[in-house]
């Protein structure tokens, strides 16, 4: 399996240039709020809580931006 040079084994591709930096900043801010030290020694439960919160906030942000728009 080919590796994405920016995200290790991730097959996700960001569509917006510079989004990786914003997502990383959000990840570390949320980890700090939750008292999680991100790294290889962190449990998957702790890492997962950070990832879940990122998803929750991104969905909320998208819903706010899309409110009132019809497709």
From Swiss-Prot:
Coiled-coil annotated residue ranges, if any: none
This protein's UniProt keywords: DNA-binding, Sporulation
Molecular functions (GO terms): double-stranded DNA binding
Database matches in InterPro entries: SASP_alpha/beta-type, SASP_alpha/beta-type_CS, SASP_DNA-binding, SASP_sf_alpha/beta
Site (Cleavage): residue numbering on this chain: 29-30
Transmembrane segments: none
An example Gene Ontology biological process: DNA topological change
A Pfam family it matches: SASP
Function of the molecule: SASP are bound to spore DNA. They are double-stranded DNA-binding proteins that cause DNA to change to an a-like conformation. They protect the DNA backbone from chemical and enzymatic cleavage and are thus involved in dormant spore's high resistance to UV light.
Note: SASP are degraded in the first minutes of spore germination and provide amino acids for both new protein synthesis and metabolism.
PANTHER family tied to this protein: SMALL, ACID-SOLUBLE SPORE PROTEIN A (PTHR36107:SF1)
Annotated family: Belongs to the alpha/beta-type SASP family.
Protein name per UniProt: Small, acid-soluble spore protein 2
